[in-house]
Amino acid sequence: MKPSTEDPPAIACPIGPVVDIVFSRWTTPILWSLHAFGRQRFVELQRRIGTVTPKVLTQRLRRLERDGLIVRTYHPEVPPRVEYEISDLGQSLAPLFASLGEWAAVNLPEVDKARAAYDVRGA
């Protein structure tokens, strides 16, 4: 069945909500880092990800916790310690990330060639 222009976006693209959750700005690097390196404190995540501001990282971590993709653990010590780790639900994305990594390794050179050809044409 061909989607009509009156169909809601979720029907027109059923993976749209997943793309919004998993591939929004900074979310993918956070999930990738927690998957690859395990439980981490805020500063460790910030260091690994790079240019993300503390405010934005905090917002993304809260959103991912709300979505059930990460777990935040508060340790009532002096000084207080907070750690983040990927949840079972977040871990279920591992095959998707592996597939995307494989696709990138194989196809990004072709994307670079296409971009260069496009730029040469001056389009």
Pin down the residues of each PLM region.
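Alpha-helical linker/hinge and terminal dimerization helices associated
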Residues: W32, D67, L96-V111
